[in-house]
From Swiss-Prot:
The chain crosses the membrane at residues 16-36, 53-73, 92-112, 131-151, 176-196, 220-240, 248-268. Keywords: Chromophore, Disulfide bond, G-protein coupled receptor, Membrane, Photoreceptor protein, Receptor, Retinal protein, Sensory transduction, Transducer, Transmembrane, Transmembrane helix, Vision. Pfam families: 7tm_1. This is RPE-retinal G protein-coupled receptor. The modification N6-(retinylidene)lysine is found at residue 255. The gene is Rgr. Receptor for all-trans- and 11-cis-retinal. Binds preferentially to the former and may catalyze the isomerization of the chromophore by a retinochrome-like mechanism. It is a multi-pass membrane protein. The keyword Transmembrane applies. It comes from Mus musculus. PANTHER family: OPSIN (PTHR24240). Its main location: membrane. The keyword Transmembrane applies.
Amino acid sequence: MAATRALPAGLGELEVLAVGTVLLMEALSGISLNGLTIFSFCKTPDLRTPSNLLVLSLALADTGISLNALVAAVSSLLRRWPHGSEGCQVHGFQGFATALASICGSAAVAWGRYHHYCTRRQLAWDTAIPLVLFVWMSSAFWASLPLMGWGHYDYEPVGTCCTLDYSRGDRNFISFLFTMAFFNFLVPLFITHTSYRFMEQKFSRSGHLPVNTTLPGRMLLLGWGPYALLYLYAAIADVSFISPKLQMVPALIAKTMPTINAINYALHREMVCRGTWQCLSPQKSKKDRTQ
């Protein structure tokens, strides 16, 4: 079990403060944008559709990632982990579960868009709700396995936040890593890529794509790919040769995904923007309804 400890060698207080500042900016940005998305969905009846339920689920997952980053930011600014061993396990579980829900949620949105635009059938509630439940139950299941001994949660290199421990590189870690990564990274990445690929093929003749078909897959790969590469390296080599500062880069990149997802999947869409504006301008919205 993890225990409270001092800063690791090779990291000064100023560098930990810099990490904490970056995490704080990422956390506040993700919470604000995804919170606005969730608020607009809850307050605007036009947005309460099965397809938008998938986007709402993604926003909830990304809010969870941002809340996890906020805890890490505060701990980094304190330059210590103040929540003890059990707090580390909870922090690791919550961060891992919401990260998996975000990755799989992105794939669910991609499949939902393919279903909507390529099958000429509206996504039904009796399909969207089980899909969202599956995403969250699957993510919670995989995140709970390290608590039961398959994998392990421990401190990240700065020692002020917790994640899946990759420093051991033993058989237990390797077996969990490759199994988990196949079902929770490679499969969602494949679903995302093929869904948007089929959409490109369907709309290639008209030349008009209803959504951006290249950005979601690239962002999924660029946002979570560095983490995957770090874990892969840890499985085949001694990760201690990589400096703690460099090991923190994938985590900082991944924490930008809530902001990117909020902009890409929700806030740039005309209907969501209109719903958000109605929520922020209640007097104007009331006036419009009375006319």
